[in-house]
């Protein structure tokens, strides 16, 4: 018989640096999950990812206090910041432009994120990434 699911916890954890401190500790502690067990397993699974890369993580907690987790690809904004060299996006979205990104770069990001995006094809995925870029204050240029 399958284990009964108690709930899901969604966190954004930096690769290779999961620690019992907030936000991980309190989120897992509320559900009675072994915090150190999660931290060790997460760090082991993400050792091949560049340290400090934010990874959206969905933790499934079962009634017997055991857990499983799935890490997804880094957020689109992480890739956009990496390409443009920005620390953060525009303060006034829509009125301020902080950098430029090409359609080719958007397509490359869409290819990386395709499995996590709610899109049927690469063009739709690229449009989703384009929306994130515009929200950050990036200008889309043809290349």
From Swiss-Prot:
GO molecular function, one term: structural constituent of ribosome
Organism, as annotated: Caulobacter sp. (strain K31)
Function: Forms part of the ribosomal stalk which helps the ribosome interact with GTP-bound translation factors.
Family: Belongs to the universal ribosomal protein uL11 family.
Keywords attached to this entry: Methylation, Ribonucleoprotein, Ribosomal protein, RNA-binding, rRNA-binding
Quaternary data: Part of the ribosomal stalk of the 50S ribosomal subunit. Interacts with L10 and the large rRNA to form the base of the stalk. L10 forms an elongated spine to which L12 dimers bind in a sequential fashion forming a multimeric L10(L12)X complex.
Protein name: Large ribosomal subunit protein uL11
One Pfam family of this chain: Ribosomal_L11
GO terms of biological process kind: translation
GO cellular component: cytosolic large ribosomal subunit
Gene giving rise to this polypeptide: rplK
PTM per Swiss-Prot/TrEMBL: One or more lysine residues are methylated.
InterPro entries for this protein: Ribosomal_uL11 (IPR000911), Ribosomal_uL11_bac-typ (IPR006519), Ribosomal_uL11_C (IPR020783), Ribosomal_uL11_C_sf (IPR036769), Ribosomal_uL11_N (IPR020784), Ribosomal_uL11_N_sf (IPR036796)
């Amino acid at each position: 018989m399958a284990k009964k699911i108690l709930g899901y916890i969604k966190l954004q954890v930096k690769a290779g640096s999961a620690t019992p401190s907030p936000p991980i500790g309190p989120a897992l502690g509320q559900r009675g999950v072994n915090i150190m067990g999660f931290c060790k397993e997460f760090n082991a699974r993400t050792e091949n990812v560049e340290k400090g890369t934010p990874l959206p993580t969905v933790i499934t907690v079962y009634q017997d206090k055991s857990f499983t987790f799935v890490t997804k690809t880094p957020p689109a904004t992480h890739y956009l910041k990496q390409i443009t060299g920005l620390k953060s996006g525009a303060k006034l979205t829509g009125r301020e432009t902080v950098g430029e990104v090409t359609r080719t770069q958007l397509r490359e990001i869409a290819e990386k994120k395709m499995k996590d995006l709610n899109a049927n094809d690469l063009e739709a995925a690229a449009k989703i990434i384009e929306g994130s870029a515009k929200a950050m204050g990036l200008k889309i240029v043809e290349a």
